[in-house]
């Protein structure tokens, strides 16, 4: 099972996104085995989708909520609880700045649920401690 990073959700949702086609190719191949979202990815999807600089046009909240609902109503979708922050996880040792906190937490959420995080952010996989790179799949 795969937890979709917000960059994958944005690319899937909005056809003007630069990664729209690779996101759909990945999703078409992998969604039958299931995919997940969590509160962190869902709220980030809402926030970023309402930013015209991110999606290329001005959208209203009703449009964005409808798109989010299309993900959550998909037959292969699961909602994963974020849970309490695991401050003892070894993945935190490689965090060097504020922009890596949410990424690391998403990896830990995926790990806790027995899955992996799927993203377009190749640097995320490289930052993980040795032996944990399998927790992230990068769409290329």
For each predicted feature, which ranges?
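Short beta-strand scaffold positions
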Residues: 37-39, 101, 119
